[in-house]
Amino acid sequence: MRFRVLNTSPLFDYQEANKITQGVDVFKEIYAIKNPKKETEFWIKQIVANHSTLRCIHFRLVDEQPKSVVMQIIRATKGHPQPEVQSSRPDWTGKERSSDPYEDKLFMQDNTAESFIEMAKQRLCNRTEEKTRQFMYQLVITLRTSEVPFLRAVGFCCMPSCKWNGNRCPEVRGCGRFNKLSDYIIQDYRDCYIEEE
């Protein structure tokens, strides 16, 4: 398993994108950009804020996992990650197509912080298949222990949806550990509009 930031200078690219939204071209000031003292904490704040300019930073995951796990990972499409998976086409591989869901497949996925965190929200959920959830935990631990501050920050921002929603489950049929987010929203609705119906 490996992660790699695809940007040569993520901090510069991010700050350039931010300045462009303000109508300022900072390309001439490339040497003026300094790394923050607590870079991982800086990135955590930026990732949690989730401004659109953060999408200019991309990173790649490459690994080999059972086909059943790979399919669950690449089907998490919020934030538009870009997956590539080892082909099973007999005319390319010279082998018959396998129906074994546990056959290992090489895959690669390009992510933004947003797309990876959205995938983690889904795949760290207690309702996710155990093998997929355990693989997602491995990915998060790998990110959290990365030497790259941006990747480390992404790892620490990964948690199930219920944690992002203040311990309120967004699923229709959750695991039962937390109350449903929809119940809180419905109660708000009833408190505001019950007399109209």
Residue ranges of model-derived segments:
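Family-specific signature for flavin-dependent thymidylate synthase
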Residues: M1-E197
